[in-house]
Amino acid sequence: MAFLEEQVDIVVVGAGHAGVEAALVSARRGHKTLLFTLSPDSISMMACNPNIGGSSKGHLVRELDALGGMMGKVCDQSFLQSRMLNQSKGPAVHSLRAQADKQVYSQNMRHLVENQENLHIRQGEIVSLLCNEEKTEIRGVVSSTGARYYAKAVLICTGVYLNARCIYGEVSEETGPNGLRRATKLSQALLDLGFRLQRFKTGTPARVDRRSLDFSKMEVQKGDVPVVPFSFSTDPATVQIPQEDCYLTYTCEEGHEIIRENIDRSPMYNGVIQGTGPRYCPSIEDKVMKFPEKNRHQIFVEPEGRYTNEMYLSGLSSSLPEDVQMRILRTMAGFEKAEMVRTGYAIEYDCLNSLELENTLETKKISGLYFAGQMNGSSGYEEAAVQGFMAGINAVQKIEGKEPFVLDRSEAYIGVLIDDLVTKENKEPYRMMTSRAEYRLLLRQDNADLRLREKGYALGMVSQEEIKATREKQEAIQKELRRMENTYIGANEENNRILESIPSSPIQSGISLRELCKRPECNYQNIAPLDPERPFLSPFIQEEVEIEIKYEGYIKRQIQQVEAFKKMERKKLPKDICYHDIHNLRLEARQKLDLIRPENMGMASRISGVSPADLSVLLIYLEKEKERRKEEK
């Protein structure tokens, strides 16, 4: 029987947020790329919430944009509302979040993919992988029709579709999200190749018809004015558009009682659901049962699009039966006559144990095979997108015979995310958080371009125009910092009157603008009357200048911490090291080190089960090996 055969450079399996970033990277670097999807209509589909960004996730989107990824640019073309979160806190945790129009976002990303040279979309299900005889090198993929697609690298970005099952109450449907077709055979193919899979779960809330809601009983949540774009390349003037409102309501004790009365019908509590769910995105039934002292929980009511009446209920994820969900809805203020458009559900799916991966997202078992996105046990559109970009760029680097591209924990949230995935055994869907980043004052969302644009340019992902703008921004910041250092104001009556109006204490002698700006009550804006000669600078440059001045001491301290971190990262561990021969290591440490095979002492130090004493043993072993090699020479 004859089957279709085709030769390409790179195959990407799955066209969600990870898959499209990976495929775009490959094609933009000039490689013939085939992007497989179960349905071209679901390219970059936002299957759950209508948000992009948020706490720490906004950092990921901006880092992706700085490297040359597309999520930020497309979000700027598709948003309904934008807010900078955590503005009452320090700049390290400021995070941009946008409500996106789900349909428009997906359409805009599909338009990009369809018009990208070297990139071809193919509808179909991939059921197995082609490898060399030893099962150590990838050769391509096989589709459900028997067609063979040969490639130099293969990227698996299948999201939550592998053996997916959607569950609510007594109903269990063998489908992907929103009733879409699932993938049924690739899991077994991966198991046959020796990969370890695990079963995770996530959930989504009901959607309601906005016409059935009484918004006068809810708190209005407005967007920020002016809007800050996600992409450093977007002209801020183009995103100053009318924004859609979101709303805040609350659950109540009556609704909580309905949940408690029906908890035996919850598939999470009666044993029907086997997968592990995300700790930081609990269902409403989980919140009610685990926090009985709380008599209400916040529910954010968010539009799914400009031209649909569907509203998303953030905070009300549930897999309770349909009738119970409807009863709970109608106990909330403004929801007395609510009509449900879609029922909330939980979805179980297969994913890879991410300890199978190198920090390039290439598998340890099979050269040229990469995994990215929720398939790696992470959660969220943003976590998926950055993994897709990193897997894509590393696949390209490999087939071109170039060095891998890896970001460490001191360089980017992306580095923290991937390092956590490949060194820690994640027993639940991994969510990025600012608290996971040790050097978060250096890894702010506002300076992602200053940190990473040069790297993106070196990779061929950032244009000449974009790098020029970043270099000019960097130069303007440094120039203004020097000017403020060298500009003094005198201790006279007029200047002290201005200081009093801030209010700030008077000065007794001359002081530099930089020193003055360090005062807690002073900022770049309110000292402007004391600085009539200051140049015109964009708000983004002003922000960088102020942060550099106000947090100078903390920034210097973190830079010193990074230097100590880099020292450990530079201590490489031999690839052929046999941990079972290092007898002073504890058994657990030997087993974990042998399983994960860390590249350096820094990675080894972050492995659960490897103690400081084990690290000391490793350091002594490395020194002895160094001396032994010297003697052999």
Language-model segments: residues:
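Beta1/beta-strand and adjacent pyrophosphate-binding region of the FAD-binding site
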Residues: 4-18
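Short hydrophobic core segments
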Residues: 13, 148-159
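Conserved beta-strand-loop-beta-strand element in the redox core of flavoprotein oxidoreductases
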Residues: 130-147
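Extended, charge-enriched "interface" segments that sit outside catalytic cores
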Residues: 436, 453-614, 620-628, 632-633
